[in-house]
Structures are given as C-alpha cells and as structure tokens.
Amino acid sequence: MVTENTISSERATPVTFTVPNTTPVTKTPEWQALVAHATQAKGTTIKDLFRDDPGRAGDMTFDAGPLHVDLSKNLADENTLRLLTNVARAMGIENYRQSMFNGEHINTTEDRAVLHTALRIPIEQDMTVDGQDVAEDVHGVLGRMRDLARALRKGDWRGVTNHTIKNVVNIGIGGSDLGPAMAAKALRPYCTAGITPYFVSNVDPSDITSTLDGLDPESTLFVVSSKTFTTSETLANAHAAKRWLLRELGHTGVDVKDDAVVKDAVAKHFVAVSTNAEAVAEFGIDTRNMFGFWDWVGGRYSVDSAIGLSLMAAIGPRDFMEFVGGFHEVDNHFYSEPLEMNVPVLMGLLGVWYTSVLGSQSHLVLPYSDDLADFPSYLQQLMMESNGKSRRLNGDLTTVETGEVYWGAQGTNGQHAFMQLIHQGTHLIPTDFIGFVNPHTDAVASDGETSMHDMLLSNFLAQSRVMAFGRDEDEVREAGVEEELVPHKVMPGNRPSTTIVADKLTPRTLGALIALYEHIAFVQGVVWGINSFDQWGVELGKKQANELLPKLGANNGGADVSTGDSSTDSLTKHILRNRRR
C-alpha cells in the first residue's frame, strides 16, 4: 500500500519560480573551498580513510525506505561531504526542492511544473497546481487503470472473437517504453495472472515483427503510449500492429472487409495512453479507453503514471500500488531528511564530486540481479537525458563538466566483460553495486550444497572490496606469485563505489530504487545550474529525421537529395543506389 504521507500538504498555489542562485557554482566560495580540499586530499586513498576512521562504515551508511546504502567506499571523508553539502546549500538546493514539491514551474525552458512526485501522493493530500486538484486527477487515472487491469486479469475484457486477453503489447519509445519494460522484467515473479507483457519501441521493423511472431491476435491487446499521439516511431509501430491484427484476424474468419467489424476489432484490441483524444479517435481507439497524464510529468519520470498501464496489467493493481508506495517512501526521505543524512542528496553530490572536481567521465551500475538487467539502460535515459546539458538556466555555458555517462550490466556477467578495466585500467569510474539479501528463487551449485544466491552475493561483496582496497606487491608475493608476474597481479584499489542493499526485489523496492535516482538527477542539476527536465537535443534529432525521410522515399523520383552537408548527401545517395525494393 501507499505509505503514510509525511510531506507537508499545506502548499499554496504555485507562484512564478525564481532561481534561488544564478551565480555559476564555480564562483561561489563554497565551491572554491571544495576544490582546495580536493588538492589537499590528493593522494589519500580509501584504504587510508578506513585506517584513520574505524567507525567510517557505520557513519557513512544510511537507510532510505527499504534501501540500505553504504557510501563508505567512496573517495570522500566527512569533510568532503560537509563541503559538498555547503555547495548544495549555496546553490539553493533546499529552496529548489521545496519549489519542486510545491508545483512551481522549475522547468524554466518549457514553463512547466515538475511533479512526478505527485504521481504517488495519497488521495487525501491537498495539492493544487495551476488551479487543478492534482491528487484527485492522479487517483482518478489510477482508478481507471485499476478497472482495466482487473478486467484483463479476470478475463472480463474480451477481444472481438470473445477470447480473453493473454498478451499485452506496449508500443512506445523513450520514457513510454524504457520504464515499463525495465519494471516488467524486474518484477517477473509478480506476473502471475497469465498476462504476458511485451514491449515494442524501435522503428526498425524487425522489433515489432519478432515481437508479434507467434502471438495469437485473438488474445492480444495493444497499449499505444504517446502523450501527443504524434510520435513518429510509435505511430509507425501502432499502424503496423493494426495491419497485423486485421490480417491475422482475417485468417480466423473475422470479416475484416466490413468497416463496422474493423472498428469493433480495433476498439477491443487497442487502448491508448495519451492526451490527444482527436488523434486517438482517428486511429480507431475508443476514447473511453484513453488514459491521460500531464505536462508536469516528463517521459523519463512517468513509469508510475498511466505509462505503467501494461505493467499494472501484468503485476496487478495491488502490487502496482506497492510499487508506487516505494517511490513515495523515498520522496518522503528526500523531502524531510537533512542534507547530511539524505541519501539522494549525498549520492548526487558524490556524482558532482567525481565528475566536476576529480574528472570522472562515466558511472557504472551493477545490479546483482538478473531481473534488474535492464536497469542500467533505464538509468541511461533518466540520468543522461536529464543532465546531458552544457547551458545554464540563463543560457550561459556551464563552467564545470556536467552529466555522467551511465552504463552497466547485471553481475556477475559484468565481471567477465569489463571489470578488468575497472580494477587495473587508468579510468576513474565510480560504481553503484545493487544487491538483494533474499532471492525469489534459489538453487544449489555443483557441489550440491552451496546456494547459488550466496555465490552471487559473495561476488557482489568481493568486487566492491577489491575495488576499494586492491592488493599490493607484498600481498601478491605472499600468495606465492612468481616475481616477474608480481606487477601484473597488483590491484591498485582506490576505485570508489556505493553499495545499495535491499531485502528483496519487490515492487516496493523497485519503486524506491527508481525514485532514488530520480532525485539524484535533480540534485546534480541544481548544483550544475542546468535544467534537468527538458531535452532539446532529442527534439532537434526528431525534426531533422522528419526532413530527411522524404529524400529516402520510394517515390522521390530522382528529386534533389541535398541536405546541406556533403557527408549526409553522400550517404543518402549511397543508400538510394544500393536499395533493393
């Protein structure tokens, strides 16, 4: 269930947002003190920090909802964290946080509120944004989602041939796909009602073709997720899905030449997550089966909105509300805890420390759970689309490096792929380890006794330990290694990491984990002075793709394919010359 609310409900209708501090972070005395500290601390190792402070692990471990977070293996001491929180305060983090939760328009380039946190507020909470009762709206949509999910799971929703629905295919892209797809895989043990979710996003036709191959059209429902219902990739896949549905239904005896039958088939096999009722109706979807969301919810922050409809259908309304409750727990923690004990704040500031002070270029995420295999990809959009910016809010260039390149894979696979570079390479790559005390399933290893989950956890603990403390020459020699191999087997250590542990990968835990990184992105954006909630680079790419598309069309008739640059011109001509229609 959604947890008890501790965020203040006494919030006024938002006023025009005023940026708390317009000074570049590098011009603040707090930043200069941080840089001076970095110079002074140069050469200090993680091993030194543990040696000098026996209580370090206890002092730097915190709980945020169901998440137990150990920051002690980072290249930072209490003084570093104090200086970082001073920087955050100087940049107005507390006022910014309040403004976000108040529904003020902190997305300044689009003049919008940023209120993904409102997606998980209790219905009794009083929150009005731009004159609209947010809690009532949110729970109204959740109620309609719940009704549809229950109808699907109970077999009350029937296709045009009266078959129950067994397959739910979500068609979207970006935030309309990555979140629900990741969450559906992460929560596979909770998909118990015979509803199998599928996800189509890529405009590459092989994506939808391979997904639909083998599915029964009579038992398949499509969820078309596009706020504007104009996203080109999503609409291309939606129309391909409609053609497939009608073709395959025709093979079962459905009269797909009868317009009334076609209308009925589309209405019973398609629903929409959108706000464009006219376009939804034009496609053929009954607007009573359209689920909306709001311009104060960015796509990459929308998995717990109607965008999660396919997820709710798969795991059920009760577990979906547990998922939402996990978000809310971390929202409460982020809103109410002092900066010095606030996990999203501290993790976000450590990212600033590594990126903008110590020169790190990327951030590795290693979930030791196969169910969480897609979590690093999800974080790529959340973190990189949010903070991949080089302009401050006033339009000036940033004065520090911003944004972290997120990447990763599930453990232990990553150990046999890229961990060599982490342990003995030359790059500084802070790492987040994510593990779970209890598995959903377990098995024994080849000896017939050892738990495979224990094997997983032993690797989980060992990797962060080797990263932090390494192995010096004396230890290598003590292990009996031949002298000429000693330098090759030295592990320098001093590789920073954060360890996140939860009891089990449940809907609640996953919601908390996502909310943690949502707030990390926010904290970093405030310190860097950028807008974490627009994505103009993505928009320009869409525009130019639409301009290039006619030049690649089958009916271009030898028309001019000039694009304005010789490279794109040459590539376009090469494609046209070698195309086989």
What are these regions (language model features)?
Residues 19-30, 35-161, 450-452, 457, ...:
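Extended, charge-enriched "interface" segments that sit outside catalytic cores
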Residues 29, 55, 75, 79, ...:
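Conserved active-site and cofactor/substrate-binding residues in soluble primary-metabolism enzymes
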